[in-house]
Amino acid sequence: MPPQLQNGLNLSAKVVQGSLDSLPQAVREFLENNAELCQPDHIHICDGSEEENGRLLGQMEEEGILRRLKKYDNCWLALTDPRDVARIESKTVIVTQEQRDTVPIPKTGLSQLGRWMSEEDFEKAFNARFPGCMKGRTMYVIPFSMGPLGSPLSKIGIELTDSPYVVASMRIMTRMGTPVLEAVGDGEFVKCLHSVGCPLPLQKPLVNNWPCNPELTLIAHLPDRREIISFGSGYGGNSLLGKKCFALRMASRLAKEEGWLAEHMLILGITNPEGEKKYLAAAFPSACGKTNLAMMNPSLPGWKVECVGDDIAWMKFDAQGHLRAINPENGFFGVAPGTSVKTNPNAIKTIQKNTIFTNVAETSDGGVYWEGIDEPLASGVTITSWKNKEWSSEDGEPCAHPNSRFCTPASQCPIIDAAWESPEGVPIEGIIFGGRRPAGVPLVYEALSWQHGVFVGAAMRSEATAAAEHKGKIIMHDPFAMRPFFGYNFGKYLAHWLSMAQHPAAKLPKIFHVNWFRKDKEGKFLWPGFGENSRVLEWMFNRIDGKASTKLTPIGYIPKEDALNLKGLGHINMMELFSISKEFWEKEVEDIEKYLEDQVNADLPCEIEREILALKQRISQM
């Protein structure tokens, strides 16, 4: 465990910005203990100012970590070591005394719902990595708020890091700087420690001037101590500790203790032509279009969608029983490939300035490029790939890494919701689950009850490309789109969701499931998607008001034949889009039951077992 050292240390590190005396006592102790351990040359207490940000960006440009993209205003490109490009589930752990606090004990094999590490193993791993790991580098102290500063739903963290890329990215993704330090006072904060794991002088040359230590990468969460400790990776999901580490893994555990929800969900506001507005939250696995839905331009005349957040929602019932949600983030950390003027015009407008791109391709005129950008190149313009080599479409490999990213301020989104920073949050009236299902699952259905809706979330599955190319596409279980992000035992998480129905005066949101990705026999999508998805949101909007007509099926309520507004669309095969096959659903419920019984085992709530049985029975009577 991180050592609890005595106060008043004789730090050899020189404080180059800020003053230790100005820090709250607990923050100062956290900093001094870890500075003594990691031995940086300098300490820089971040103030979050424009001036500081400009200096750090300039310094990274000089060191070759960032390149300036001259086509845009204050936009930058980082190319990472090719071994450090994504979250690494196998090296992401939660440390608790008891394994069962972190994951249910599966019937056989390993848990797919998280990775547990014992306290003893973590202590060994920590002591093998952190002593002296920041030698020759600067330790940056990043005070940050998840959620609007001062909101009752917000939480504060302090991240210590030796990566200026992390500082610049955290300034976009969180509210960061002096105002946060002033707000901490004697209050609680989550302690975040990050190192790229490359003390100076270097033992090996860097690739792309990108410091990382892939052999020793470890991302650990210590929920009982409110600590997140990350070593060896500079990539966003592993190093921007406010993101998945805090906002989902740590926060879901805090939420369980404090009676709220921390979820992998977008939040959007939708307004009908009469000016009535509702807020919806939606959970989809990666690459199923969360950001596209959150920033949609509706094709339906008179309808308007506005974005509160594209990735994470913190939700809590207020005294009146409304489920209130905030977006704890301050920016978007979006997947670049596939983003275009056609698929997401609002994202394209958002990223024209003040944006850090990572592992996308660069054009010779100082622009960015990726697969699916759908923009013609000016004549004579060449492309340099994310591997820093000249690239042409004949190369047989992508110019941008499939997980390449843009990190951009949410405030720049042209359709950001007026209430996106509202301290009390926005009232959620509908929750949407969804996945990429080429067969069997209809475009939309509504859960029969809160309990049934929780089961629908637990049963979420989505098509993923297997790592081994020859395996083709497989359908993966991804309950609540949270499978890589649960901060505690998934069985207890389900019980926590079910308990929301007991909340006094709770106005429970309706729960829906969508599938934009169903295909016909020729492998063509049956539904056009993107802006046309507003037609499905319209039906949900009217369902929440008790207006739209439905048909009861074994899996839930679907729209009656004429209930979806298809005006202006070409031919849509509604029969195929909404068909529910007995054979398919018998197999589906069997797979779901096996997964939940194997993986959640003794911790599966009896309400979920009852929902499985009831669904089986309804299907058998088809």
UniProtKB/Swiss-Prot annotation:
Disulfide bonds: none
Region (Omega-loop): 457-487
Phosphoserine: residues carrying this PTM: 19, 90, 118, 286
A single GO molecular function term of this UniProt record: GTP binding
Keyword Nucleotide-binding attributed: yes
Binding site for GTP: 287-292, 405, 436, 530-533
Pathway: Carbohydrate biosynthesis; gluconeogenesis
SUPFAM superfamilies: PEP carboxykinase N-terminal domain (SSF68923), PEP carboxykinase-like (SSF53795)
Cofactor(s) listed: Mn(2+)
Stated induction or repression of this protein's expression: Regulated by cAMP and insulin.
Tissue specificity statement from the Swiss-Prot or TrEMBL entry: Major sites of expression are liver, kidney and adipocytes.
Associated disease: Phosphoenolpyruvate carboxykinase deficiency, cytosolic: An autosomal recessive metabolic disorder characterized by impaired gluconeogenesis, hypoglycemia, hypotonia, hepatomegaly, hepatic dysfunction, failure to thrive, lactic acidosis, and elevated tricarboxylic acid intermediates, particularly fumarate, in urine.
Listed name of the protein: Phosphoenolpyruvate carboxykinase, cytosolic [GTP]
